[in-house]
Amino acid sequence: MDVRQRTEEIERLTLAPWATFSDASRGRVRPEEQDPIRPVFQRDRDRIIHCKAFRRLKQKTQVFLSPEGDLYRTRLTHTLEVAQIARTIARALRLNEDLTEAISLAHDLGHMPFGHAGESALDKLCPEGFRHYMQSLRVVDKLEKDGRGLNLTWEVRNGIVTHTKGTWAATPEGRIVRMADQIAFVNHDIEDAVRAGVLDPATLPRECTAVLGETKSQRITTMINSILRSSEGDVQVGAEENEAFLALKDFMYRTVYVDRSAKKEEQKVEKVLTELYEYYLTHIEQMSNFYLQLAYQEGRDRAVTDYISGMSDEFAIRTFEDVFVPRKWHVL
């Protein structure tokens, strides 16, 4: 018996009956030999951490576009906070932490530069529309490793495409990530909004803070405890906490996410991405051979969408300047 098999045996002895067991995975698109040390979901987690798309998250916007200061969240810090909350819940419920962490780390790999403003802009441009969760799946299936993809397990791939609105994940670990994503972004967006001066913490709805808590730590702890109390055979949150949380999220959408200063920047985002999109449609030779091949196989729109969606905020701005902003030149 090798290390992996011993780990799988420990899972069978210690995890809850409704957990997703590594040795019962539905497998990968392309079958592979088992690793002698790591179970399948741990291998997925490792592949995600080492992929290029994961590294790009450090320079992609969470909510505030190009904020001044080092303390604001990026898409990477958001991802790590989701993973922390999700793993805490998974461990307490005796579910599969490796699967939970893998889904958490991959759930936003397909996010555009400039956050949801970028997603909205590309959704208008792309004939097929654009949804970051579907792009996240495309990243791990098709775009990483020069077109070979990461060949992740079915369970992780399912968790990626179901972490937001729509169909619930097929595994309890995937459903944990969906809840952890919501808990993380609402609470850290409150903190960032206060730091940015667009939100006074005293204006948070009293009916929400009375249930969830006054601080970020209190609110996260309240939601985690509610899930732990309410989940037996399925992942759920208590009715009172859920109602307060939804009201708090609605408050954030009505106040912070529609802030006028943020909206002005979003107009600039749409212009930058529109100009880049239209430029590369007619100058596909400016993209790498990998994207040229994609254009040949799946069409120019698809290839340009993949190329732009993979850009970091800084790379998109720098590319826009290189293409459209005149440079000084010297005459001898």
Question: Which positions does each model-derived feature cover?
Answer:
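Histidine-centered, transition-metal-coordinating active-site segments
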Residues: M1-T79, A83-I89, N96-E97, G118, ...
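Aspartate-rich (DDxxD/NDxxD/DxxxD) Mg2+/diphosphate-binding motifs
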Residues: L99-L125
